Regions:
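C-terminal and late-domain segments of enzyme folds
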Residues: 30, 227-231, 243-253, 261, ...
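Conserved beta-strand elements of the Class I
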Residues: 15-17, 97, 234-236
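ATP-dependent carboxylate-amine ligase catalytic core
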Residues: 5-92, 100-127, 136-140
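Internal gly/pro-rich beta-alpha loop/helix module
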Residues: 106-226
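Beta-strand->loop->alpha-helix junctions that form or flank phosphate-binding loops
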Residues: 18-19, 154-162, 261-267
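Phosphate-binding active sites in nucleotide-utilizing proteins
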Residues: 223-307
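Structural motif
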Residues: 65-67, 97-99, 129, 279-281, ...
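Cysteine-nucleophile active-site neighborhood
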Residues: 285-367
């Protein structure tokens, strides 16, 4: 974020990206750059999807800054670089600025850094930022070790500072939508302070590299709907403090082919008028479960629409919201009543479910139509219990845990609700969902 801020301060238009499936980090990029950050994930989007998103987003920008995911070489498995920051860098031909953590290390830090540089010669590490420096003496030892061993220039030296620590929760950072204006201003102030310890001119020099362009961008057509009818379809999307896990690309893909209107399961009384479909994304319904419980009107409205076969697509937090209840961690006796479309309960646990998923659709007769496989990811601390055994499951997982025993996606009427998060750029999920909404509209 400091690099994004520093480039912006020099007058450059910065397009931020987050490598990997994370929903929260991009909201911090937005606060710094005032531009919508986009995710780049090879597993979710495919190579073509990466180029499509990247090239489209950077058309009017001077610089693209990509925040990595986990360690440089961490991806789908330990066998290769697939889906890692290094892999993404190789696809787009982007240089890497390596940030190394100096806590409890000095000369050893040089050995670790040298290992990163030599681990994969195809990866272009062009600059190093040393983070979490304890003191001037600590820095002196580090520089002495780097001097004879590391040829890549050090372009940033950042000292430890408790004031720079960001607020966290069980799934990581707290989404900026939940933060007060003061907290967001502090994030920007911290980025400003840290940027002063980075050689932004050197960043500019490193960043002036040519990006590969292997793409002829073409929108996927919806063959079964006349273009004149597309703007008649309205899809309502849940968006508030409880539900805000959406990829920017997904929203834009829907917007190209249908009208969208946002609503709040916390504050809205009904789904927007003339809606033909509903999307309820992920988020933190457990945090504000009491407010969701108290909005009886919207819950009743959603349940009635679902029972009348309105297409509804829900992921993770949306799945939890559509069950009978949500119980918080260490207080499972208190059940907050939710929509109750699916006869099951959600409880929060202390155990993290995290990883990429691969799913096969069990039927072509759902709102997602005839899709062979779906790539996604799951990231949650909740668990579905006491589910009615008669509930149909939309997906069988080749990879991942899902709701129960390698199956995911509760399916009822025209609704699918899964733990799996998906990206629309590399699949026909959005087109098939819009077609389902069109059929509903015509009834």
């Amino acid at each position: 974020m400091a690099i994004m801020y520093g480039l912006g301060k020099k007058g450059y238009k910065v397009q931020p990206f987050k490598i990997g499936p994370d929903y929260i980090d991009p909201s911090y990029h937005n606060a710094i750059t005032k531009k919508s950050s986009k995710n780049l994930d090879v597993w979710l989007m495919g190579k073509k999807g990466i180029f499509e998103s990247f090239i489209t987003a950077t058309k009017d920008s001077d610089f693209a800054v990509l925040e990595g995911v986990m360690g440089l070489f961490d991806g789908l498995s330990g066998k290769n670089n697939y889906a890692s920051t290094a892999h993404l860098s190789a696809i787009l031909n982007t240089p890497i600025i390596l940030v190394v953590d100096a806590r409890k290390a000095a000369r050893s830090l040089a050995a670790i850094t040298l290992g990163f540089i030599k681990f994969d010669k195809k990866i272009k590490i062009k600059g190093i930022i040393i983070n979490q420096i304890a003191s001037d003496r600590h820095l002196k030892y580090i520089l002495e070790a780097f001097e004879s061993k590391i040829k890549v220039p050090i372009i940033g030296k950042i000292f430890s500072n408790r004031d720079h620590k960001l607020q966290e929760r069980h799934l990581g950072l707290i989404p900026t939508r939940e933060l007060e204006t003061t907290s967001i201003n502090n994030i920007v102030a911290n980025a400003k302070n840290i940027s002063q310890n980075i050689d932004i001119e050197k960043v500019i020099e490193i960043g002036n590299s040519e990006i590969k362009n292997e793409l002829d961008i073409k929108d996927k057509e919806i063959h079964n709907i006349k273009e004149s009818n597309l703007n008649k379809i309205k899809i309502s999307i849940a968006l508030d403090k409880s539900f805000n896990f959406y990829y920017k690309d997904n929203i834009e893909i829907i917007q190209k082919k249908a009208k969208i209107e946002f609503f709040s399961p916390i504050d809205s009384n009904t789904i927007p008028y003339d809606s033909n479909g509903i999307i309820i994304g992920g988020g933190f319904p457990e945090i504000i479960a009491d407010a969701l419980e108290k909005n009886y009107a919207i819950k009743k409205n959603i349940l009635k629409l679902a029972q009348n076969n309105m297409p509804i697509y829900a992921e993770c937090g949306g799945l939890m919201y559509l069950t009978n209840s949500i119980s918080k961690y260490k207080n499972n006796k208190k059940k907050y009543k939710m929509v109750g479309l699916f006869d099951a309960e959600t409880i929060m646990t202390g155990k993290l479910t995290l990883g990429y998923t691969e799913a096969i659709l069990n039927s072509s007769k759902t709102i997602l139509g005839n899709i062979k496989t779906v790539h996604g990811h799951e990231f949650h601390y909740s668990k579905i219990i006491n589910n009615n055994k008669d509930i149909k499951m939309a997906y069988t997982l080749r990879r991942g845990k899902g709701i129960i025993e390698g199956r995911d996606g509760f399916s009822l009427n025209n609704c699918i609700a899964s733990y799996m998060h998906t990206h629309f750029i590399n699949s026909n999920i959005s087109n098939n969902f819009i077609e389902s909404c069109y059929k509903y509209m015509k009834k």
